[in-house]
Amino acid sequence: MIAWCFQSLGIMLGAHWAYAVLGWGGYWGWDPVENASLLPWLTGTAFLHSVMMQEKRGMMKVWNVWLVFCTFLLCILGTFLTRSGIVSSVHAFANSQIGPWFVGFILVTLTVCFVAYVKNHDYLKSENRLDSVVSRESGFLFNNLLFLVACIAVLSGTLFPVFSEWFSGSRISVGAPFFNKIMIPIGLALLFLTGVGPLLAWRKTSGESLKRNFGWPLLAALVGGLITFVLGYRAAYSLFCFMLCGFVFWTIVLEFYRGAKVIAARTGMSLIMSAHELAMRNTRRYGGYVVHFGMVLIFIGLAGASFNKDVQQTMNLGDSMRLGTYTLVLQSADAKAEKNYTADRMIIEVLKDNKEMMMLYPEKRKFAGTAEQSGTMVAIYSTLREDLYVVFAGQDPETNLPVIHAFLNPLVKWIWLGGVWVVMGTLLALMPNRRAALVLSDASQPAASPVAPALNPSITLREGHD
């Protein structure tokens, strides 16, 4: 889980760097190296879910072992893709001779994994079978299958240029449309299962339980869809995503509310304090729900990408361009010199509904000692509703006037907030249960009396564990 947390944080920071530094207006371009970081995250996330089936029911042991093997191998494959130069990427290193060593290491590791599996196969037999399609076990199984399909799709698209060159002699690349066409439906299905899973019981879920548990979340989905429709977010995939986000959010709220209500009735604490106590008594379960809440925020931000707008214009001093409710006016331009770079800076006044809001200062920098390597400094005005993202894209070759490229990206900030919640939820899940800590503390002390009743640690731990 610690490794998964760092992987999640790395992916999020990489996306933020691409957004704030590269100046292309986006945060994820399905670049081969970006994909390489996503592959082990997908299999690792699948393992974190399916290992709960092994813990609770003694199922999917072989599957879990191979998920661990594949996650490690995909980490090495990602390093190979980045360091060998076999794929074209803005993040990749130059061509080197280290590639064959990585291939050899991957083959040796795969052989060791297979031998270890064969030798221990008898210890990996499932202790139970699937009792019902409508059960939490089925939810985890479908969840894992979707993660596996997503991993295969991303891996195939990433390596397709390499295979096409081997077999046809020409390198054929697949772009973002290919990945989006496959990954958007898979992502929505995973989001749906994120909400459904907590509502299902182990072994089998009765019809009465389904009616009782699904009513409010479905109502929340309809309300969320109606609100986003009224606000003008009407693209089909995005509207469905907002509805699913409402559904998942309400399932999380219900899980906290039901548990907190019981604690409040027993202790007299407020619901908020009871929810905190609930989370501390079972950190793994409720830390997972916090992670799911973070994923809801991320999906809200991703859905906003369907409504991105941009405009590019060659501008003279005093010229203006309009983007959504914003008007951008080029007031002036200046140059500055620092120790290791020189920069051309545009000074742009931003008006909203004809009212002055702020000044933005996008730059184009040239760094000394790097063969005139240039870099873009983006100017961003960010709110929960949208980002105004302004880039000085260079000079028009014919007129020598500055070219300004402005983007209006809705809901991007929700992605970064979601990433923070994912990390916080993981840290909560890594903490020991409060009740378990008390038991361990008591166990380290001598008994007060030989006739004192013994405290059964296993019972106490089960009370605080999902």
Language-model-derived ranges and their functions:
Residues 1-466:
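Solvent-exposed, non-transmembrane regions of integral membrane proteins
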